[in-house]
Regions:
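A generic "structured core" feature
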Residues: 135-141
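Extended, small-residue-rich solenoid/repeat segments and analogous flexible loops
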Residues: 1-37, 41
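Conserved catalytic segment of ABC-fold P-loop ATPases
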Residues: 131-134, 147-149
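Flexible, glycine/small-residue-enriched loop-and-beta-strand segment within the central core
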Residues: 5, 31-38, 43-129, 155-161
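Conserved beta-strand positions that form and line the central face of beta-propeller blades
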Residues: 27-29, 49, 141, 151
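Short helix N-cap motif at coil->helix boundaries in the Bergerat
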Residues: 144
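Short alpha-helix at the nucleotide-sugar/activated-sugar donor binding site of glycosyltransferases
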Residues: 84, 134-135
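Acidic, glycine-centered active-site loop in nucleotide-sugar glycosyltransferases
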Residues: 148, 153-156
Length: 161
């Protein structure tokens, strides 16, 4: 049965840092706990997986990460404050390029700035940078920079403010 971890259970996770008033489901999986920082007021829902045995994951204040999400911090993932990462979002800082005869690994940091909203089942690829107050539509695939206050959906970028 799903529930939020108690203060003692949060402390016993032995993350690099866990802030105050965080709500983390007991069904969240962590790999590389010593490389994961979660600031105050953040909520992470059921069946989310955070992998940082190589690299790191930093999550800002008052951010929500919906259930069934996956964050892979091989080269680093930085998520700002007051973000909403919807259910099923995948964030990768490592990927593979099979377009040539030889497999080439792509390792690039992902930066998600403050007050960003990412819709359900979106995929954020290595090297992506999403600036403040931007929105990513559900099912979108981001592989580049989304400038401040823009909406990216259906492979289009639109200024929203």
């Amino acid at each position: 049965m799903s529930r939020y971890l108690t203060k003692l259970e949060l402390k016993n996770l032995k993350l690099k840092y866990i802030g105050k008033n965080c709500k983390i489901s007991n069904l969240v999986s962590f790999v590389g706990k010593k490389n994961i920082t979660i600031l105050d007021g953040t909520r992470i829902d059921d069946f989310t997986v955070l992998v940082a045995h190589k690299g790191y994951i930093n999550i800002g204040k008052n951010t929500h990460i919906g259930g069934l999400s996956y964050i892979q911090g091989w080269k680093g993932v930085e998520i700002g404050s007051e973000c909403n990462i919807s259910q099923g979002v995948k964030i990768y800082s490592k990927s593979d390029n099979y377009t040539k005869k030889k497999n080439i690994q792509i390792l690039k940091k992902v930066i998600i700035s403050n007050r960003v909203i990412i819709g359900s089942n979106a995929v954020i690829l290595p090297g992506s940078k999403i600036e403040d107050d931007s929105r990513i539509g559900a099912l979108s695939v981001v592989s580049h920079k989304i400038t401040k206050q823009h909406l990216f959906a259906r492979n289009r970028i639109v200024k929203i403010y």
